[in-house]
Structure formats: C-alpha cells, structure tokens
C-alpha cells in the first residue's frame, strides 16, 4: 500500500511465478519489478510524493502473512534488472524498498475466512467485473457478453508482453 501527499491510500496486488516476485538486493533492501496491469500507476505516483510503503505477502496454502514496511523509490536501471526478467518481460521500472520493519502476521484471519479452502469459495456471489462495468455505464455500446469476453481475454493475454 502507498499513500499520496494528502494521505489518500492505494493498494495494488502484484504477482509473478513463485519465487520471482521479489528480488533481494541485500539484507535490508528488496526490489519488485513493474509488470503490465491496469496501467493506472497510482502507487508509483504516490511513491514520488510519499515514499512510505506497506507490503503484504500472501503465500497460497500458508495462513501467516509476511508484512514489510519501509521507504520506497522507483528505479529505471540497476545491476539487478536482469534478475527481474520473467517470461521474456524486461521491466521498465522497479520499486526498491528499504526495509524498516518486517514481521509475520498471524493466520487467524485466513483461518476464519477459509481463504485457502477452494471448497468454500463462492465465486458467483459477487457480480463479474463486466457486470459491474455494464451496470455503472449503462449507455456503453458493448453488450454484457462482449464485456465478459473482453475481460476474460484481457486477463489471459499480455500478462508479460512487451507491448503496452
């Protein structure tokens, strides 16, 4: 999570294949590569005016959560950038975090929510992104079916592509 100079917060999920999300620069510094996503870059804008960040790391199947707090900066080139390449995608930026605090958070919330128990999941309880989009922009020329197809393809394609 980040916050702008007015204290307005933003939290944005990050993800890469197991073992490739975070690069350990040294004992007190980590780097997280920029990856194509929704292209909003809210968190990066926030870091430019307020370097304070809070990170939560969720590992599927584990109840505890690794939490890191620190000061971040954006870098566009560093010796470790080759280590950030995933599936041929060379990041144009990395978020470098100087760690000030690191600790594990207990598993009670995940245990109560049964987050890692697929048999408890109810994906149809919430409307889809396409349904929410159509409901909030009813004059959109796209049908719900077109939006469902678009979002399905958008999530699957271009995750690591070089095009933006």
What are these regions (language model features)?
Residues 1-164:
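Binding-site signature for planar aromatic cofactors or substrates
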